[in-house]
Every structure is written in C-alpha cells, then in structure tokens.
Regions:
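Alpha/beta-hydrolase-fold catalytic nucleophile elbow
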Residues: 59-60, 112, 134-137, 159, ...
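Serine-hydrolase catalytic machinery in alpha/beta-hydrolase-like enzymes
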Residues: 3-104
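Primarily recognizes the serine-hydrolase "nucleophile elbow" in alpha/beta-hydrolase
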Residues: 99, 107-152
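Conserved alpha/beta-hydrolase "nucleophile elbow" surrounding the catalytic nucleophile
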Residues: 31-33, 109-114, 161
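C-terminal catalytic histidine-bearing segment of alpha/beta-hydrolase fold enzymes
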Residues: 173-215
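Conserved alpha/beta-hydrolase "acid-adjacent" motif
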Residues: 165-171
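Short beta-strand/loop motif that positions the catalytic acidic residue
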Residues: 157-160, 164
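Short, proline-enriched alpha-helix->beta-strand connector loops that line the catalytic pocket
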Residues: 151-156, 182-184
Length: 215
C-alpha cells in the first residue's frame, strides 16, 4: 500500500514492492515544474511492477512554485543553468538519503523525471553509478557532471515528443550529442505526434529500459 514517506528532508509518496517483501531495487521519479509527487506516482503501477522486489518513490521538490500555489519546483526556471547547478546539491542529498534509507547499492536504483525533473535527472545523475537514468521531455542544462563519466556511468534513456512546445525536441538531440561525446550509453525515443507529455509508447520504452537494466 502506498504511503507518505520522508527520506532525509524530502517528503514523497512511496510504494513498497508489490511482488515481494524485500526491497531489492528502487525507481525514483522526479516531477516537473509546478507539479508534485502525486503527478509522478500515477506511474508506480506501470513502472514499479516491472521487477520483483522493486519499490517506487516520488519525492516532492523542496521549493514552493510561485506560479502554482499547490505545486513545487526543483529550481526557479528563470535561473536556467545556474538554477540546475545549485539544485544539484539537493539531488545529491536526496540520493545519499535514499542510499542510507534502503541500504541499496546505486546499481540497483533508476533515477528518472519529467520535464524539470528530467533536467535534474540529467544534471545530477551522471556522476552516480546508478542502474540507469530516464528523462521524459527533459533537457541537459549543464555539463558540469559529465566530466565525471566512468566506464560504469549509467545508461541513459531520453524520451521526447516531436511536438513538445514547452521543452522543444531539439533538447533531446542536444542532450544525446553531449552525452555520447562524453562516453555515455544513450538510447533515444523521439515520438511523432506527441507534445509535452508521457505517452503509452514512452512508458513502454521506459518499462523495457527498466527490465534491461535492473537485475
């Protein structure tokens, strides 16, 4: 049964494994700008059941969103790259709190996000030896962490609609280029006729990615 769970300073919605009692892997999904944890938690039944023993956690971003009274943000969108760089400290804190909470190795955790959550995934995630990173309609705002790429740096799935009028699809091409240049293993799904949203096709791609990269 889903529950509100605080991990470190982050409060979010947690779904324990449905197919097992012991947590052997974890999917963390970060919501977009002006949304909250509930926005991503709807994906738990779809993505969280791919692997036996897999739990699902959707944290709320730490800051209230001025443009959305009930929403949250990872950083002020007016700050662009600088905002993403400053917010990486929050993601570091989140990941380290998760490691402590579940006693899981990074290699059993997938980090993903939608829109601004996808931006944060690509900003902070590459420095960790995670099982994988998934960005839905995101962008690579900063290359600060990419120099830390190693042989065991995580595989990355980029999913984007070609009709996205919020984060243009060119962001996918740009991210792919920079990530591959630094040696990352990147899989790209550019969906025709899809705007700024997560489609069934995108979810199928994410499920396959999770199945391939979580043991």
């Amino acid at each position: 049964m889903a529950e509100i769970k605080k991990i470190g300073k982050f409060e979010g919605i947690y779904q324990p494994p449905i197919k097992a009692d012991e947590v052997t892997s974890l999917i963390i999904l970060l919501h977009g700008w002006g949304a909250d944890a509930a926005d991503m938690f709807g994906l738990a039944p779809i993505l969280g059941q791919v692997k036996q023993g897999c739990a699902f956690y959707a944290p709320n971003a730490p800051y209230p969103c001025a443009a959305s009274p009930h929403g949250r943000e990872w950083f002020d969108i007016q700050q662009g790259e600088n905002g993403a760089i400053m917010a990486m400290d929050d993601l570091d804190e989140l990941l380290n709190s998760v490691f402590d909470e579940f006693s899981l190795p990074a290699s059993q955790i997938i980090l993903g996000g939608f829109s601004q959550g996808g931006m944060m995934t690509l900003a902070a995630g590459p420095a960790y030896e995670l099982a994988g990173l998934i960005s839905f309609s995101g962008a690579l705002l900063t290359e600060q962490r990419l120099a830390e790429a190693t042989v065991s740096s995580p595989p990355i799935l980029l999913i984007h609609g070609d009709l996205d009028d919020v984060v243009p699809a060119t962001a996918l091409i740009d991210a792919q280029s920079h990530l591959e240049e630094k040696g990352y293993d990147v899989e790209v799904v550019l969906e025709k006729g899809i705007g700024h949203s997560i489609s069934e096709t995108g979810l199928d791609s994410a499920r396959h990615f999770i199945d391939s990269h979580l043991s």
